[in-house]
Amino acid sequence: VQVPWQQQVSSQPGETTMCRFLLLTAPTPCDMRPFVVQFAQMCQHSTGLYGEGWQGDGWGVAWCDDHEGWQVQRSVAPIWTEIDAIQYLPPTHHLLVHARSASFAHHKGNIAYSQPYVCAPYAFVFNGFLKGVRLPRRVPGTIGAEKIWWLVQEQLAQGVPPQQALETVYTMLERSSRAIQACNMGLSDGHTYAFYNGNPHGQAYYQLYQVRQETLHMVCSEPFGLWEWQRY
């Protein structure tokens, strides 16, 4: 079964762009809105691997409420056009935000495809560029991100620890793909994060980066602001 993945179809030959995501964690609830706004501004000006990029096919944010668990807000508009919506985010200690670059034109405009994906107690984000994926069995989902999330959930349901679950899914995809340029995943249970930076060719555009600002820890698919980001 061939699986479609997050590859941007562009009017400029050879251009490849990818979704962007940001994960933030702090020991106690704090105001994370300024970081989300800066992330949105970065997405507006982000460039692809070979030129102009586009992360304007929708966005979503998931934040953890101490009493009600994961709360989710999604949109099909470019994130930088909805800064006002970001201002309503409450203080939190765990937050994931994702800006989408749709693989195919017919997959645009569907809010169900906007990440993060949530199935308590986990929230999940993905970006990647995989070619010629043929899994040995049919996997639920319409787009590649949904299929990957289903594979991760399958591992978690079997009691596999989050980090190992991401590693196992990457290995599975690696065996089933003609080529992987990138396959990055982030997973949170509202208390801890797990990441997988699948960047086999070591290209900066496909790299995850992290920074610690006092007690705040951020992991992002592209540096922003004036912080000293390090490769994850």
Model-identified regions with their sequence ranges:
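Short acidic (Asp/Glu) patches
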Residues: 45, 74-89, 97-120
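Short histidine
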Residues: 131-189
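Serine residues within intrinsically disordered or low-complexity segments
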Residues: 10-11
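Extreme N-terminus nucleophile/cap motif
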Residues: 14-77, 200
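Domain-scale activation on soluble regions of proteins
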Residues: 50-56, 63, 70-77, 91, ...
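Conserved catalytic micro-motifs used in adenylation/nucleotidyl-transfer and phosphoryl/amide-
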Residues: 19, 113-130, 174-232
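A residue-level signal for conserved active-site and pocket-lining positions in enzyme catalytic cores
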Residues: 19, 61, 96, 148, ...
